[in-house]
Amino acid sequence: MWRGTLKIIFINRRKVGIIVILLGLMITLVGISEQFDDKLKTTILVENNINLLDDYTGLDGKISYKLPEGWTTREKKFPGGEIIYHNDFQSSDAVIHGFVEVWNSKEDLKIFLENSKKISQGQNIIKNYKMDSIIINGKKTYLVHYLINVTNNNWYKAYEYFIADNGQFYRISFFTRDVNFKEAYGAIFESIIDTFNVN
């Protein structure tokens, strides 16, 4: 004959109700914050006279991205096969410049960046170097930002984004003189990076 014990579980309906309401509020807040973030980026673009974005593609359509209308671009070719795509860009007011690159590299991206930092610090004066790991369009991305002294106390602020992808990595770099840098530029750069896709 079975002689088990019977356990009775009491559920406090009030606590369960509060937990359900809190979970619902948290989900709602996450959704609202994502919409707010998108609208904030759009507002920052408009406030900086960036109303439209032009489409760009590279490597026969393998990559696509957008840059603000009126920015000038120029593709360059490099020998050696390491850099297989390079497109320089400059803002219409010549304050922001940079480039989009695709590299062939089997080396781990983080190790590549650490080695690049050592080499660059040996050749240049660099301050406030910081590397963050973020997610852009579902891909792990390294954001490297720093100040670099180009000549005679002429400092430039750099924002560089690196995305690894199967034996290649993508580099999107933005540079502006430190005296011209505005806090809104970080959001502008991120809005441009959000348009970058590997097809």
Q: Which residue ranges define each predicted feature?
A:
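N-terminal targeting sequences that direct proteins away from the cytosol to non-cytosolic compartments
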Residues: 1-89, 154, 175-199
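Conserved polar/disulfide-associated segments of primarily extracytoplasmic proteins
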Residues: 2, 7-11, 77-165, 169-171
